[in-house]
C-alpha cells in the first residue's frame, strides 16, 4: 500500500511542467521554514509568545533570500534524480546564509531570537527541505532496480554542454526506460567530468568501443546545433553497432515542459542531415496582418495548405476557411486544428476551384482579408499524362480564384508557385508559370493586392520523393533514383509555409517572391541519407538508377538570368523582376488552350510559358 501511495504521489508531481514544479516545491519549502521556526520556538521557550507578525517577517525574509540564492545557483527549488551532493550542500548554505542575513536585519528592529535558536532553525529547515529530495532519489533507485522487467535501456548521451545539461534537468520521470550510463562529448578535455552525476566517458570517436563495453542499446544526441556531417558520423557508428539513435526535442519545448520525461526524445530525421536553419516568424508584422482577421486557404487539406493553416492559427485570426476539393483531407485537418487551437472559428468548405460561381459565393459569404492559394496539381509525370487536368486546375482554377478575389473585393491574394515554373520543359511547371502571369495580370487592374511565392521541393509533402524512399526502404529496397546527377532544392514544409506567410505580409504590387532554398541537393545523396536514417547500409538497401521520367529536368532553377533580383525584403525572401502581361492577352491564350487537348495542348502551354519567362 505504501509503495503504491509513493508511486501515485511521484507520478502526480511528474505531470507538472517545470514551472509548476518550481511553484510546488517553493510552497513546500516555505511551509518547511514556517514549521521549523514554530518547532524551534516551542523547543526553546515552551510556548509561542511573540505575535504572529514577527514570525511572518523573519520567515518571509529568510525565504526570499533563500530563493534568490538557490535561483542564482540554478537549482530553482527543483528536485532531480541526478542531484549531486554539491546541490544538497548549496541548499544547506542557502538556508544558512538566508537565515543569518534575516537574523541580522530583524535583530536591529526585533531582537527576538538567540543565536542558538537560529542554529536550530537552520538545522530543522535544512532537514525538512532536503528530506523529499533525498527520498526522491532513493525511491527512484528502488523502483528502477526492482522493476525486473528488462525494459530499461542502457543509454549514452551525446553532448556535455548546455543541451546535455538541459536534457538531464528535464528528463526526470521515474518510470522512464531511460538509464543513462555515460556521456560523450566532442571536447576530449571534458573526459572525467560529471554532468548531473553522470560521468563523461570520452569523445564521439570512443563510441564504438565504449558502447560495446557498457552494452549500450540507445544513443541520444543533445546538441541542438550539431553539424549535419557529425549527425551522419554518429548514425553510421550506431548502425554498425546495432544501436538506436535519437535526438533531444527542440530546446523551447523542453524549457516549457511540453515533453514528458523519458518519452520526449525523437528520431533523427532527414532535416537534421540536410542542416536547414529554421526561420522564426515576425510576430509584430504578422500579428497586424493576421490577428482578428478572416483567412481563407485553398488546398487546405494538402501539405502546404494545411501547414499554412497551422502557422496562421498561432496569430489568433477570427476565422480560417478551409477550402478544398477532397473531403477526407479537409475533415482530418479540420479536426486536428480544432483540437490544437481554441477560440478560432474553423470553417470546412468543400469546393472545387474550377467552379467560379461556388468560389465567389464562398468569398462573398465569409469576406476573407487574405486568400492563400495553395490548391494545385503538382506531380510532374502525372501532369505529363494529363495535360488537360493540369490546365483546368492550375490555370483555370487560379484564374477563378484571382477573379473571385477581385469581384469580392478581398484585400490580398498570395499564390503558391514553384521553381518548376522557371524555363519549364513540362506541363506542371508551365501551368504554374501561367498562373504567375494571371496573378500579376490581375494585380495591374484590380484594387486587391496580388503576389506569388516561388520555391522548390518541400520535404515530406505528399507526392514528394521522401515518402517514396521511405516506402521503398520499408519494403527492403531497392531505392530508385532517376539519375544520380539530378539535383533539387529542398525546404521543410513548416519553413516554406512560414516564408509564404511572411512574403504575403510584404506584398504591395504584384511581386513574385523567390525564397532562398539554400544549396541544391543531389537526389542520390538524399537517398543515401534516407538509407542511413533507416539503420541500414547500402549493401542491405541498394540504390539503383532508373532513368529520367517524362517532363523531368536534371537541375531546377529558382530564376533565370534575366529575372534580376531587385531587393531582399527579409532574410531568405527576395523579389524577382518578372515579365508582366496584360490580363486581356492572358485571357486570349486561356481561350486558345481551352480548344486544345493532348500533346497539342501540352506543347502550346510549354511554349507560351517559356516565351513569357524572360523580362522585357
Residue ranges and their predicted role:
Residues 1-150, 240, 247, 371:
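Signature of alpha-helical transmembrane segments in polytopic membrane proteins
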Residues 2-7, 231-294, 406:
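Flexible, Lys/Arg-rich cytosolic regulatory linkers and terminal tails that connect or flank
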Residues 45-49, 139-255, 328-332, 339, ...:
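A solvent-exposed beta-alpha-beta segment
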Amino acid at each position: 500500500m505504501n509503495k503504491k501511495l509513493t508511486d501515485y504521489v511521484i507520478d502526480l508531481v511528474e505531470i507538472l511542467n517545470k514551472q509548476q514544479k518550481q511553484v510546488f516545491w517553493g510552497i513546500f519549502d516555505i511551509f518547511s521554514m514556517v514549521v521549523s521556526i514554530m518547532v524551534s520556538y516551542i523547543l526553546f521557550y515552551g510556548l509561542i509568545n511573540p505575535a504572529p507578525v514577527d514570525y511572518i517577517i523573519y520567515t518571509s525574509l529568510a525565504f526570499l533570500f533563500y530563493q534568490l540564492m538557490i535561483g542564482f545557483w540554478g537549482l530553482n527549488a527543483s528536485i532531480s534524480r541526478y542531484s549531486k551532493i554539491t546541490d544538497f550542500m548549496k541548499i544547506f548554505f542557502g538556508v544558512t546564509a538566508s537565515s543569518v542575513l534575516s537574523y541580522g536585519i530583524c535583530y536591529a528592529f526585533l531582537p527576538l531570537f538567540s543565536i542558538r535558536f537560529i542554529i536550530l532553525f537552520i538545522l530543522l529547515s535544512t532537514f525538512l527541505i532536503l528530506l523529499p529530495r533525498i527520498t526522491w532519489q532513493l525511491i527512484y533507485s528502488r523502483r528502477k532496480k526492482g522493476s525486473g522487467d528488462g525494459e530499461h535501456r542502457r543509454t549514452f548521451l551525446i553532448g556535455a554542454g548546455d543541451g546535455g545539461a538541459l536534457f538531464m534537468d528535464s528528463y526526470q520521470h521515474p518510470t522512464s526506460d531511460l538509464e543513462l550510463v555515460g556521456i560523450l562529448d566532442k571536447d576530449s578535455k571534458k573526459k572525467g567530468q560529471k554532468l548531473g552525476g553522470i560521468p563523461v566517458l570520452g569523445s564521439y570517436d570512443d563510441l564504438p568501443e565504449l558502447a560495446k563495453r557498457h552494452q549500450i542499446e540507445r544513443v541520444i544526441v543533445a546538441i541542438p546545433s550539431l553539424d549535419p556531417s557529425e549527425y551522419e558520423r554518429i548514425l553510421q557508428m550506431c548502425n554498425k553497432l546495432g544501436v538506436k539513435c535519437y535526438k533531444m526535442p527542440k530546446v523551447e519545448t523542453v524549457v516549457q515542459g511540453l515533453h514528458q520525461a523519458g518519452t520526449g526524445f525523437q528520431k533523427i530525421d532527414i532535416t537534421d542531415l540536410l542542416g536547414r536553419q529554421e526561420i522564426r516568424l515576425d510576430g509584430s508584422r504578422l500579428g497586424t496582418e493576421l490577428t482578428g482577421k478572416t483567412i481563407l486557404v485553398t488546398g487546405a487539406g494538402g501539405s502546404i495548405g494545411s501547414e499554412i493553416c497551422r502557422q496562421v492559427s498561432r496569430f489568433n485570426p477570427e476565422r480560417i476557411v478551409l477550402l478544398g476539393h477532397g473531403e477526407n483531407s479537409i475533415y482530418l485537418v479540420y479536426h486536428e486544428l480544432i483540437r490544437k487551437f481554441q477560440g478560432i472559428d474553423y470553417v470546412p468548405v468543400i469546393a472545387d476551384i474550377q467552379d467560379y460561381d461556388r468560389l465567389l459565393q464562398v468569398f462573398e459569404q465569409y469576406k476573407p482579408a487574405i486568400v492563400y492559394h495553395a490548391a494545385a496539381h503538382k506531380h510532374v509525370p502525372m501532369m505529363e499524362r494529363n495535360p488537360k487536368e493540369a490546365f483546368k486546375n492550375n490555370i483555370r482554377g487560379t484564374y477563378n480564384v484571382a477573379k473571385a478575389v477581385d469581384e469580392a473585393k478581398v484585400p490580398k491574394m498570395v499564390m503558391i508557385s514553384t521553381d518548376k515554373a522557371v524555363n519549364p520543359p513540362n506541363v506542371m511547371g508551365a501551368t504554374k508559370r501561367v498562373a504567375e502571369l494571371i496573378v500579376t495580370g490581375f494585380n495591374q487592374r484590380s484594387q486587391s493586392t496580388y503576389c506569388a511565392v516561388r520555391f522548390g521541393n518541400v520535404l515530406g509533402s505528399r507526392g514528394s520523393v521522401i515518402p517514396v524512399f521511405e516506402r521503398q526502404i520499408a519494403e527492403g529496397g531497392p531505392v530508385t533514383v532517376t539519375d544520380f546527377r539530378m539535383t533539387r532544392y529542398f525546404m521543410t514544409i513548416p519553413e516554406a509555409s512560414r516564408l509564404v506567410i511572411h512574403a504575403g505580409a510584404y506584398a504591395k504590387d504584384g511581386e513574385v517572391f523567390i525564397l532562398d532554398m539554400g544549396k541544391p541537393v543531389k537526389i542520390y545523396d538524399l537517398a543515401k541519407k534516407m538509407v542511413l536514417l533507416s539503420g541500414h547500409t547500402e549493401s542491405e538497401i541498394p540504390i539503383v538508377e532508373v532513368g529520367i521520367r517524362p517532363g523531368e529536368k536534371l537541375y531546377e532553377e529558382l530564376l533565370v538570368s534575366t529575372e534580376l533580383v531587385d531587393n531582399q525584403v527579409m532574410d531568405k525572401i527576395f523579389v524577382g523582376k518578372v515579365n508582366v502581361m496584360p490580363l486581356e492577352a492572358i485571357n486570349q491564350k486561356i481561350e486558345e488552350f481551352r480548344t486544345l487537348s493532348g500533346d497539342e495542348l501540352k506543347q502550346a502551354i510549354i511554349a507560351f510559358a517559356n516565351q513569357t519567362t524572360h523580362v522585357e
